[in-house]
Amino acid sequence: MASAGKPNIDDGRRGTSSPKLKGRDHAKDTLCRNVTIYGRCRYEDKGCVFNHDPSRVNDAQHPERSSSKKRFNVDSPSFTPSATPLNGSSGLKKSATISPKAANAAPFLPKGVLSRSNAATPQSQPETSTPEWSIGEIQDFVPQGFDTSHVESIHGHGNGVLSTPAYDPFVSSSTPLGASGAVTHQVQPNPYSHDPSAIGGAAFFGAHNAFQQPVQYHLYAPIGPHNQNILGYQRNIHDLFLPNSFREELQKKAAATLQTLPNSQLPTQIDYFHSLVPLDLSHQKNAAIFGYPSWVYKAQSSKDGNFYALRRLEGFRLTNEKAIRSVQNWKRVSCGSVVTVHDAFTNRSFQDSSLIFVTDYHPLSKTLAEQHLADGQGRYQGRHTSGHIPEQILWSYVTQIANALKAIHSAGLAARVIEPSKILLTGKNRIRLNACGILDVVQFDSQRPLADLQHQDLVNFGQLILTLGANSPSLMHNPTKATEHFNRSYSAQLNNSVYWLLSGMQKDQERTIDIFISGISSQLMSTFDSSLHLDDQLISDLSRELENARLVRLLTKLNFINERPEYEHDRQWSENGERYFLKLFRDYVFHQVDAQNAPVVDLGHVLTCLNKLDAGTDEKVTLISRDEQSCFIVSYKELKKAVEASFQALLKPARRI
């Protein structure tokens, strides 16, 4: 062993050197102790026979570690891929140390840059039986959907190198490369290639059996418009549920539609209609408008099952068949402000000759006379009058009736009946012209020019607005007083519009419904804006009721799974595994009892459990068997997974085994 003190290099008389093991040939595989102690041996070049390279000693002592050493070493001066030795010849032994030539090695260039440089300087490919790896032959990463024609020049086309199909991470590994036969083996998949499903590489991975959460239909998204007058922590009941007034209105309309009249004296069948229910509020006959007493009924059609309104003209005798054919023109009128006419026919089921008009049925609708007028006698006796009508509501009526007359006159027809008792109020400030086309049949023989009838519609329109604004059903008896009251109550624009309508029969200038609509365009925009706000509100209300059947679907799946009689003796299905604690969960939700062993009927508990199950929360629940010998602690997420898996097993029985 070398001396611990500092030796004198120039002293040639001292023969101290690295210890030598005479007679041992493996001294070259023994690490010199000077290297271990001092880090180097000063006698390495003066005859020391021991090994001064620790890496060679480790390779000699651990040959298995040397064989597993990575081929690509960061200490190597340049990247040189390994090739299979030809004819079984052994490859050259690589040096593990850094070569002095490493200082002159070329700088590292990315693959794309190097491939571009190769395109500029063609190189000849060595002629060997086995193709060698080339940087230019490897394609760059190109997502699916990207046009590869723009990057063909990068992959060696035109550089003198024969391009071979390279590895594509988006192609299944079972697909062989190319048809040239140069490479016959299959390329192994690259475990480091990133292939998110959003790029479209889902086909690269096989299907897996892991449980996937379904689309979260139970997560309701608040759809506008939103109320900006409340703070962030404040909530209204309308923000969570459908407004009670709207719900009650729809329920009442549904009940009125399905209403029947037992022990009725009405005919059981009129043509293809049945289940007649009278809609008139008075039993007094009134023939002032049509010339015949008229009655209105609700009936159900045997053809489509829908409900319609039947208006019967009592005692009418049809003398001209062409008169009833005029109803065909009214079938083509499609307007939201006109009650649609579907059919007209004569019938003797009421023990007389009656004319029946079939129109749409709007449940719980009122007439404008019932809503705003009360004369103290006749049909409207004792009804509450709303008094003065706000001008904005009156303008809403004007725009809707103008819309109806626009559609009717454009079809070459005339309404002829614009009366408060024949205009339906089907919703909040929502009106529709009713009983249109009846006078075309009743007064078919005494036809007037269409232009005169349309001008008369304008006059009747003005008289209607004046009657409603003055709150005077007897307008014709004292028109001056009604006009003065109307002028004092409403703006000049509304007064001028009504005066223009009342002058519809004058020949001093052209008067059409189109000219009238142009004059009230500002009010049309206001009404249109209100309809848009109502549309937004209805969409918001509908979004809250979009998935209100999700708990029913969940209950249906649970009932499909639990206690199936065909699997009663199949322990794999009913008494073991996930089906068993689904059965216990059913008892936990619906079959609880109190301290007195009485059934607990708690709808809130049922809804809470089902909502948590539908959401798949991480909250855990304790399930105990009926004999109290088994206890499970599971989460709602696991329960939801079990429900979906069991239901899919029912759809595909082969999975159950």
From Swiss-Prot:
Residue runs in coiled coils: 522-560
Domains: entry comment: The N-terminal zinc finger binds to poly(A) RNA. Contains a pseudokinase domain. The protein kinase domain is predicted to be catalytically inactive because some of the residues important for catalytic activity are substituted and it lacks the equivalent of the binding site for a peptide substrate. However, it has retained an ATP-binding site and ATP-binding is required for mRNA degradation, stimulating the activity of the PAN2 nuclease in vitro.
Gene: PAN3
Organism taxonomic ancestry: Eukaryota, Fungi, Dikarya, Ascomycota, Pezizomycotina
PROSITE patterns in alphabetical order: PROTEIN_KINASE_DOM (PS50011), ZF_C3H1 (PS50103)
Subunit structure comment from the entry: Homodimer. Forms a heterotrimer with a catalytic subunit PAN2 to form the poly(A)-nuclease (PAN) deadenylation complex. Interacts (via PAM-2 motif) with poly(A)-binding protein PAB1 (via PABC domain), conferring substrate specificity of the enzyme complex.
Annotated keywords: ATP-binding, Coiled coil, Cytoplasm, Metal-binding, mRNA processing, Nucleotide-binding, Zinc, Zinc-finger
Gene Ontology annotations for the cellular component aspect, listed alphabetically: P-body; PAN complex
Region annotation (Knob domain) ranges: 561-657
The protein's name: PAN2-PAN3 deadenylation complex subunit PAN3
Family matches, as PANTHER family: DEADENYLATION COMPLEX SUBUNIT PAN3, PAN2-PAN3 DEADENYLATION COMPLEX SUBUNIT PAN3
Entry binding sites for ATP: 311, 360-367, 421-422
GO biological processes: mRNA processing; nuclear-transcribed mRNA poly(A) tail shortening
Protein family according to the UniProt entry: Belongs to the protein kinase superfamily. PAN3 family.
